[in-house]
Amino acid sequence: MTDVALSQDVSRFLRYLGVERQLSPITLLNYQRQLDAIIALAGETGLKSWQQCDAAIVRSFAVRSRRKGLGPASLALRLSALRSFFDWLVSQGELKANPAKGVSAPKAPRHLPKNIDVDDVNRLLDIDLNDPLAVRDRAMLEVMYGAGLRLSELVGLDIKHLDLDTGEVWVMGKGSKERRLPIGRNAVTWIEHWLDLRGLFASDEEALFLSKLGKRISARNVQKRFAEWGIKQGLNSHVHPHKLRHSFATHMLESSGDLRGVQELLGHANLSTTQIYTHLDFQHLASVYDAAHPRAKRGK
């Protein structure tokens, strides 16, 4: 079996994912990138057939990937794609067992999410509203910080998802789970301002937030605009949508201490995902202690 034949098997798998599983083009592209990298590694190891692949060869793929500078998280993604591919080959009767089943990547160090402090959030939101797109951006910033939305949830908002009388939005989160969220008085105010101007761009588009071309704004466009506003407003740290979500979670937890409530607002399936913010909260408390407690003031 040549590299071409190896690639043909991968192409068949990708067609299966696209047609039968109906995965998104972005997900398919990610699978293709990972499996193309595996095919290149297979060429380095002299692998001629997927049937020749065993756990030792899969481990060699992992080692070679690490030597090429692939981080633990990216390696885990690559091995996950390979396991899915081998599972499919097993289902097709082309492999007896999945050789990647017992091979795992080293655990990635868990970095605490960085957040923006309250003063910087206020400075970020105090933007120059000299054009309709700036009003749109202010509304997006207010909604993102006011409800802790994921970027995909923000760009996926339609006008029909709003209830401005109650100050709530309906969002579709991960796993097609819908949740109803309060967004706060300021977010409602700026959505109303944006809706007054939105007709300048489109009238028959369902999306709440539009690009200057009158279409649903893209995630990339939101990232770009938020970063630009961070620079314009003089923030020291890079502003991206997920950092606003982190800031929402951290500030909510610091104020309320209600971990379960924050979990529901963020749409986390597992409490353990939300618990990372307790570490951020502890860091805040520890810094207060070190600055204020007499026993913490060493050498004074």
Swiss-Prot record:
Presence of the UniProt keyword Cell division in the record: yes
Keywords of the record: Cell cycle, Cell division, Chromosome partition, Cytoplasm, DNA integration, DNA recombination, DNA-binding
Protein location: Cytoplasm
Activity modulation notes: FtsK may regulate the catalytic switch between XerC and XerD in the heterotetrameric complex during the two steps of the recombination process.
Residue stretches making up the Core-binding (CB) domain: 4-90
GO biological process: cell division; chromosome segregation; DNA recombination; DNA transposition; resolution of DNA recombination intermediates
One GO CC term on file: Holliday junction resolvase complex
InterPro entries, per database record: CB (IPR044068), DNA_brk_join_enz (IPR011010), Integrase-like_cat_sf (IPR013762), Integrase_catalytic (IPR002104), Integrase_recombinase_N (IPR010998), Integrase_SAM-like_N (IPR004107), Recomb_XerC (IPR011931), Tyrosine_recombinase_XerC/XerD (IPR023009)
Main location: cytoplasm
Domain of life: Bacteria
Active site: 150, 174, 242, 245, 268, 277 (o-(3'-phospho-dna)-tyrosine intermediate)
Residue ranges occupied by any Tyr recombinase domain in the UniProt entry: 111-290
Molecular function, one GO term: DNA binding
Phosphoprotein found in the keyword field: no
Family named by the database record: Belongs to the 'phage' integrase family. XerC subfamily.
Cited function: Site-specific tyrosine recombinase, which acts by catalyzing the cutting and rejoining of the recombining DNA molecules. Binds cooperatively to specific DNA consensus sequences that are separated from XerD binding sites by a short central region, forming the heterotetrameric XerC-XerD complex that recombines DNA substrates. The complex is essential to convert dimers of the bacterial chromosome into monomers to permit their segregation at cell division. It also contributes to the segregational stability of plasmids. In the complex XerC specifically exchanges the top DNA strands.
Description of how the protein assembles with itself and partners: Forms a cyclic heterotetrameric complex composed of two molecules of XerC and two molecules of XerD, in which XerC interacts with XerD via its C-terminal region, XerD interacts with XerC via its C-terminal region and so on.
Protein name: Tyrosine recombinase XerC
Record gene name: xerC
